[in-house]
Amino acid sequence: GVSLDQIENLLDSLLDLGITFIDTADCYTRSEELIGRYLGDRSGEFVIATKCGCISGGDGEEEYSRAVIERSIDRSLKRMGLECLDLVFLHTCSAEVLRAGEAADALMRARDAGKVRYTGYSGDDADALQAISMGVFDAIQVTFNILNQTALDEVLPAAQCAGIGVVAKRPIANARLLPPDSPQFYGGPYWDPVRSLLTDEGAWDDPLECSLRFTLSHPVITSAIIGTANALHARENAKRARAEALSPKLLDALHKLRPED
């Protein structure tokens, strides 16, 4: 498992790099506990985002019920030693759950009680569109990367029209661009054309950099999150994120490669 020393080294490195946004979740139990042990009186140096409502392992209760969400938020506050969470996302509940209203209402109640500063939804496709259409969330967290551009046509434009923040998850395509991974693991038939194009453009030397730059090139993306407990990987990804933007020509070519629905 990950040690407190690793987390301290990682979060110290993030601050040195000017990175202050931390994403975690109630169901990532150990993550929140280690973050809390690190933070102490330094919580003001970070923007802490977590996710609620998804039950890890199940406890006989209905996910996304008001009681589950309330307890989820309270656990996150306690683990991280915080009085207020900067941003809390509903954790990948369906459009049907969103329409029922109980989950969103529970999150808004926590905001009104001063436990949450900003509210959000984490999910993709029709579920994300439902969340945006409700007009109650401050941000969404969606999958968007060089191998999965499904958010490009509807979700990102809808978020832009709504004026809400967008956090991109899986911005380096779960590192599936690196050997020994291949199309059957991620990206399907889109994998080979992307690899061929990036090779032709001389961008295959560091496919992770190209993928991260692709994600960050979209003007609606507020932030991109990459899971790691390794300070060296964090520094490498920070360097990738600060590289030159992809050319409009390459971006257009990558957009045109995406599969038709």
Enumerate the predicted regions with their spans.
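Short hydrophobic/aromatic-enriched beta-strand-loop microsegments
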Residues: 45-48, 137-145, 244-251
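N-terminal binding-site loop/beta-alpha segment at the start of enzyme catalytic domains
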Residues: 1-46
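A cross-family glycoside hydrolase active-site/sugar-binding cleft signature
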Residues: 23-25, 49-51, 88-91, 120-122, ...
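Alpha-helix-loop-beta-strand connector modules within alpha/beta enzyme cores
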Residues: 33-51, 105-114
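Acidic (Asp/Glu)-rich catalytic clusters
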Residues: 36-47, 77-81, 132-135, 161
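Glycine/proline-rich, positively charged
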Residues: 1-2, 12, 16, 58-154, ...
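Structured C-terminal cap/extension of enzyme domains
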Residues: 12-15, 19-23, 134, 154-261
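Conserved, mostly hydrophobic/aromatic
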Residues: 22, 35, 48, 76, ...
